[in-house]
């Protein structure tokens, strides 16, 4: 599958019914303002799914459009309005007494459809036990439905249902080896580097100070055996002191920090929580984790070193590995050590105060005695502060003993990082204190826990929130403040900007006081990992802040989806804020060895690059994972988790093979092949489209964390004071959403599948599409009278004659005037009164006939017979492998004819007449746009709206090949042997001539007077002339389409030919090797034979 196809598919999924549902309602509202007035809601509380909300409304007076929202995700579907009669038949058959009003009956129909995986079908008589829902379950559901109307809830849903877009996001990239400097300099990784981009953007995260970069020159003895021995001793000493350092840090946490925290929570507390947080900063545990990982790798590399025999070449390899190890781990240190070093300035005051507490002194002495380490608390808490300069001392000596080259340069970069760490706290402390002091003046009620030495200010932006209150829309000014770990929301006192004031705090000292216009009220904050920050796909200046979990802080729990607007003048500022947010998420990972970014058009993709070993230890994983490997047997399934998509790039020969894996019920290509030169663009396009797919607010993912939907529904209903009552106990049939919700914890490590978009594993081997369609036909055949079907066929044949009466159809699609609309209504009424015939149509122009024909299809036929091209019919087509309707292929006609035989005879006859009319219209319409418009309207009338372009393609194919499709089923063509081909051809020609002679009417020469032509002959000639022009137009269109499709086929053919050529070349090489081996064996055999004959001759002589 090519990238363009993937892009269109992903964009379609991102706004399709299953993933963005409410766009259907918004479009319907624009077409029909009465839609909002008829909008009704119903709720019930399911024991497994929790609270379920369903909204529905009538469309065109005969179709119910419904949208359901539950923990399983969103679902949108349409129901033919006579569905209520099915409910009555079901209730009568099962002796269920339902006292349901009209509105409740419609709600029951929507709930019934929602609880069934397949399209609802009912059975009467003895087979009622095969019904898709159990009688007791249905009875309890329909008895507990609560129906109500709410215009404010309708508007709230419309505002939330909009799909979202993203231009910046984070991806985890996994490689076979560590992504260090040697990896970046390896030319064999050039194609991977084009994908993950540049790492220069993150150099500012190391926060270079004003001090010059260190420069070193190797000593004269560098590289000699004495220098190598001395260097080994330094490395051993450094490793031993690192082990002691890690042991002391663990002693500090286990024997001091944890016991004192436990005592602080009881009545025996020795120090308060504030003092404990000062002495034992939150980043202390992170330092232990980082240094333990550094020590493990340090020891692993040193274990390969032979201390007795000095192999200079092997030592150089180990030395380079050590240098790269130091650089990568010291870079990780630079993210966390500065916070500890900065807070160390307050250690002395707290220890001085604690030394005056006798019980604390007693506790300290007892711990020091039990530990038998002879190290006090004051020394332990200063260990990280003293350790950083010691790294620098060790490395200074190691660099002098290292020869100039890549290894020495890597050591120099490591020293540079360490010295920057030592100088960071002074710079950070001044800026941080200035910013937080200013924030406390601007936001007087700022939460105390927001001020922390481990928190860095990153960016802020002024926005406006749309808020619905008492049915009126209010605009409230807000400001979003972004820190490295949290996002803060404040409400401004006025419309004046405060973002510029906050940003200026980085460079200038805060004022003692600010005016009222420059102040704000603190609303709340949330963790960056707990929210999604995305932009609208429709309005460029709209921001969505979506809370992922119901355990969010109170404000974000009450409003899980916040919609903000930004001034168009600040769109660039908004882009910068998006990038800052994604960069903060990327920098907050614990294990990546390298950070990089790549741009494509307006999109920025941040890559966290790992080795496989590093990623197994990563706790904060992204929802998109790329595995870049040369190993065809890589175990990609261990990287799968709930809610993510894994893309594997496997390099083979001159191409890259892509495969996609996910537990989500989304449609993804199974495999793709990309040439090396197209790798970057293709890869980034795949990532962008997949991220769009995942970022819809109502995307059905994270099924093990089902808080968002419950949180959202509770908010929507409680905000409008909607009454709720329900009781439900039975579990429903095996395929119902209740069973799906139960099975969420049984499959795929608590991963699940959505009702709309996937099939349960337990059902994968029990699908029989033909059986489903046949079951649904039993009800249709039972309830649809044969007489009404025959009458409908007569009406359609009359329409066909009416269209043929008019020779010029260029005005067919002209809009109707008011007078013509009245005439069209009268014509439609005559159809319903059964006073309709072909002669009646001859008095109307083509545009009135066509408008009446469309109304007849969408209103009368749909109400009488339902959707003729049902969802099960289209799904059956989708299950046929290699079925391509874009070409006039015999197998496509065969499969279509075979599946059509499952339809009822009446429906088949109706479809045959409809597509006969469509075929005639498409052949006679002069313009391609007119043909496309007619095809789309037929697709809307005959197929469910959820299938979109697929339904249009199907209708187009059925119309142009109606004469071949609507007939008896033909077997697929079988290969014919050359011996019989000529005989079969002669038989076919003779048979065709016999049939033609038999069907040819007798023609008697008719005398025609000179200069006179009969009107019938003239009309027949005129009709044939226009028919010929239409066929020429059709052939022109097919020629244009072939010009587009043939290059794709040509490229695919060249690719296949290339593979065949490679295979043939490989086969020739193997055969040549076999031939050479045979020749060599023969020569050896002949030489032995000659030697043997020579021996015998000598013996004889």
From Swiss-Prot:
The modification Phosphoserine is found at residues 736, 977. Residues 230-428 form the DH domain. It holds the Pfam family Nod1. Keywords: Cell cycle, Cell division, Cytoplasm, Cytoskeleton, Guanine-nucleotide releasing factor, Phosphoprotein, Septation. It is found in: Cytoplasm, Cytoskeleton, Microtubule organizing center, Spindle pole body. Residues 210-219 have a biased composition (Low complexity). InterPro entries: DBL_dom_sf, DH_dom, FYVE_RhoGEF_PH, GDS_CDC24_CS, Gef2/Nod1_dom. Residues 203-222 are annotated as: Disordered. GO terms for molecular function: guanyl-nucleotide exchange factor activity. GO terms for biological process: division septum assembly; intracellular signal transduction; mitotic cytokinesis, division site positioning. This is Rho guanine nucleotide exchange factor gef2. It comes from Schizosaccharomyces pombe (strain 972 / ATCC 24843).
């Amino acid at each position: 599958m090519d990238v363009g196809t993937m892009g269109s598919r992903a964009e379609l999924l991102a706004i399709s019914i299953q993933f963005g549902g409410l766009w259907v309602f918004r479009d319907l509202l624009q077409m029909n303002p009465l839609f909002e007035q008829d909008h009704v809601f119903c709720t019930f509380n399911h024991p497994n799914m929790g609270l379920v909300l369903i909204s529905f409304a009538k469309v065109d007076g005969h179709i119910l459009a419904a949208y359901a929202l539950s923990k399983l995700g969103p679902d949108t579907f349409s129901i033919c309005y006579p569905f209520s009669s099915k409910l009555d038949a079901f209730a009568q058959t099962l002796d269920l007494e339902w006292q349901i009003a009209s509105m409740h009956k419609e709600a029951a129909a929507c709930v019934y459809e929602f609880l069934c995986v397949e399209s609802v079908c009912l059975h009467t008589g003895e087979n009622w036990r095969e019904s898709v829902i159990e009688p007791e379950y249905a009875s309890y559901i329909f008895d507990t439905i609560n129906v109500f109307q709410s215009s404010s809830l309708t508007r709230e849903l419309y505002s939330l249902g909009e799909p979202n877009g993203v231009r910046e996001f984070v991806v985890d990239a996994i490689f076979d080896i560590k992504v260090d400097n040697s990896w970046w300099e390896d030319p064999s990784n050039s194609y991977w580097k084009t994908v993950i981009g540049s790492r220069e953007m993150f150099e500012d995260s190391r926060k270079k100070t004003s001090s010059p970069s260190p420069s070193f020159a190797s000593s004269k003895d560098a590289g000699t055996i004495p220098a190598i021995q001395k260097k080994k001793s330094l490395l051993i000493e450094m490793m031993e002191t690192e082990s002691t350092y890690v042991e002391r840090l663990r002693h500090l946490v286990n024997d001091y920090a944890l016991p004192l925290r436990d005592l602080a929570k009881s009545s025996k507390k020795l120090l308060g929580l504030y003092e404990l947080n000062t002495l034992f900063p939150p980043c202390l545990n992170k330092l232990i984790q980082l240094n333990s990982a550094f020590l493990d790798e340090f020891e692993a590399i040193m274990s390969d070193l032979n201390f007795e025999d000095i192999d200079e070449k092997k030592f150089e390899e180990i030395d380079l590995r050590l240098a790269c190890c130091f650089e990568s781990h010291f870079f990780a240190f630079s993210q966390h050590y500065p916070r500890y070093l900065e807070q160390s300035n307050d250690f002395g005051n707290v220890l001085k105060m604690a030394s005056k507490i006798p019980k604390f002194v007693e506790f300290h002495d007892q711990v020091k005695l039990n530990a038998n380490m002879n190290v006090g608390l004051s020394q332990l808490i200063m260990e990280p502060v003293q350790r950083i300069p010691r790294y620098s001392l060790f490395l200074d000596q190691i660099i002098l003993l290292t020869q100039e080259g890549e290894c020495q340069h890597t050591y120099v970069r490591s020293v540079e990082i360490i010295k920057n760490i030592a100088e960071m706290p002074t710079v950070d402390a001044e800026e941080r204190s200035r910013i937080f002091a200013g924030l406390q003046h601007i936001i007087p009620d700022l939460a105390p826990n927001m001020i922390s030495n481990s928190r860095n200010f990153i960016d802020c932006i002024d926005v406006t929130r749309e808020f619905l209150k008492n049915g009126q829309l209010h605009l409230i000014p807000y400001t979003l403040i972004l820190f490295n770990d949290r996002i803060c929301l404040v409400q401004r006192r006025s419309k004046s900007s405060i973002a510029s004031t906050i940003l200026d705090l980085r460079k200038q000292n805060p004022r003692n006081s600010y005016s009222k216009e420059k102040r704000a009220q603190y609303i709340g904050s949330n963790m960056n990992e707990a929210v999604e920050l995305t932009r609208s796909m429709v309005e460029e200046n709209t921001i969505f802040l979506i809370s992922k979990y119901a355990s969010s802080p109170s404000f974000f729990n009450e409003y899980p989806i916040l919609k903000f607007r930004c001034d168009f003048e600040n769109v660039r500022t908004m882009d910068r804020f998006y990038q800052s947010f994604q960069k903060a998420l990327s920098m907050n990972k614990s294990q990546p060895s390298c950070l990089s970014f790549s741009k494509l058009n307006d999109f920025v993709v941040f890559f966290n690059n790992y080795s496989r070993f590093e990623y197994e230890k990563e706790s904060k994983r992204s929802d998109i994972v790329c595995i870049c490997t040369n190993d065809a047997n890589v175990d990609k399934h261990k990287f799968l988790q709930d809610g993510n998509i894994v893309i594997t790039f496997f390099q083979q020969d001159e191409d890259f093979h892509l495969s996609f894996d996910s537990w989500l019920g989304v449609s993804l290509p199974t495999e793709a092949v990309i040439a090396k030169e197209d790798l970057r663009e293709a890869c980034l396009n795949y990532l962008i489209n997949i991220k769009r797919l995942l970022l819809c607010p109502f995307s059905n993912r994270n099924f093990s964390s089902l808080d968002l939907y419950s949180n959202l529904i509770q908010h929507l209903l409680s905000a409008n004071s909607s009454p709720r009552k329900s009781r439900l106990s039975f579990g429903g049939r095996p395929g119902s959403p209740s069973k799906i919700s139960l099975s969420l914890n049984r499959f795929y490590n608590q991963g699940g599948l959505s009702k709309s978009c996937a099939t349960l594993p337990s059902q994968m081997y029990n699908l029989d599409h033909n059986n489903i369609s046949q079951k649904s036909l039993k009800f249709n055949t039972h309830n649809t009278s044969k007489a009404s079907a025959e009458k409908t066929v007569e009406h359609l044949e009359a329409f066909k004659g009416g269209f043929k009466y008019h020779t010029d159809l260029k005005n067919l699609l002209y809009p109707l005037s008011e007078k013509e609309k009245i005439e069209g209504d009268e014509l439609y009424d005559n159809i319903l009164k059964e006073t309709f015939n072909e002669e009646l149509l001859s008095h109307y122009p083509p545009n009135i006939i066509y408008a009446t024909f469309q109304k007849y299809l969408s209103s009368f036929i749909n109400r009488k017979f339902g959707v003729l091209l049902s969802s099960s019919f289209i799904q059956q087509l989708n299950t046929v492998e290699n079925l391509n309707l874009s070409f006039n292929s015999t197998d496509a006609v065969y499969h279509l004819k075979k599946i059509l035989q499952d339809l009822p005879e009446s429906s088949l006859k109706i479809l045959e007449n409809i597509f006969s009319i469509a075929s005639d219209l498409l052949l006679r319409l002069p313009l391609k746009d007119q043909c496309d418009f007619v095809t789309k309207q037929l697709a809307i009338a005959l197929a469910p709206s959820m299938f979109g372009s697929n339904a249009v393609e199907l209708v187009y194919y059925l119309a142009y090949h109606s004469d071949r499709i609507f007939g008896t089923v033909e077997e697929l063509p079988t290969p014919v042997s050359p011996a019989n081909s000529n005989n079969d051809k002669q038989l076919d020609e003779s048979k065709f001539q016999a049939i033609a002679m038999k069907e040819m009417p007798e023609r008697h020469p008719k005398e025609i007077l000179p200069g006179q032509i009969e009107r019938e002959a003239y009309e027949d000639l005129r009709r044939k002339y226009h028919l010929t022009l239409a066929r020429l137009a059709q052939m022109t269109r097919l020629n244009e389409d072939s010009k587009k499709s043939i290059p794709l086929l040509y490229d695919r053919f060249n690719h296949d030919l290339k593979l065949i050529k490679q295979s043939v070349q490989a086969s020739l090489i193997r055969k040549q090797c076999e031939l050479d081996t045979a020749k060599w064996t023969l020569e050896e055999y002949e030489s032995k034979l000659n030697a043997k004959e020579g021996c015998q001759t000598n013996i004889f002589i």
